[in-house]
């Protein structure tokens, strides 16, 4: 942080303390203050972003009612849209570091809202990259982060539950971000209509002005080098061989031969959130 800016740091402004507050209004005030801080393009350290995500994780943990959970799962990833490239990259990396570290501590009653948080975060990652005109250097930094954390092919400490969820949602959220859709699969039930309009049909036209090969690189690495045969098969079948890659973007992913089935039963596919 620049010299003389200590009086305007996250801690001095009380933002981190607000995020960890016991009452919801104070936590929400902390989120609003963080958004304003990000908009100001103040330089934030990696360590401070880890503290930020510790607080934001707590905000999500403490949110119980279904509508409030949906709102919070959208609000937190939306902070990406107001950050500059440098802060956005640190925001992305510390989110995934936090989620991968805390995942095994999330109980069954709370896991669905964190699945929804991940879905919205992936969506907002693509939206933010679109805002930057899919600048290749930024895309590469973010795919490196995905390869290091949720889609790491060799780190056994990363739960497969995160990998399965990423396989489930990745192409869906890429499609919605590219087509400009504001609605995720999980939030369709809360919209006023689900009819397909002419505008929706037009939005499905092919757009190939983004580096799709680089965006898919983490899954190619996972499919080639992953330790779990089930994860590798699903990465190939549900991401790299997704028909939308060809039909919408005229892209053919490298052909990776699925591992032989040696008798392991595939994991039962979880209902999408």
Language-model features, listed with the residues they occupy:
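Long, low-complexity, highly charged intrinsically disordered regions
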Residues: 1-75, 79-82, 108-110, 249-255, ...
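HEAT/HEAT-like alpha-solenoid repeats
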Residues: 7-16, 43-59, 88-99, 125-147, ...
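Eukaryotic acidic, Ser/Thr-rich intrinsically disordered low-complexity regions
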Residues: 2-19, 152-153, 157-158, 165, ...
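Helix-start/N-cap signature of alpha-helical segments
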Residues: 4, 19-31, 45, 49, ...
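Eukaryote-skewed repeat-based solenoidal scaffolds used as protein-protein interaction platforms
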Residues: 76-188, 210
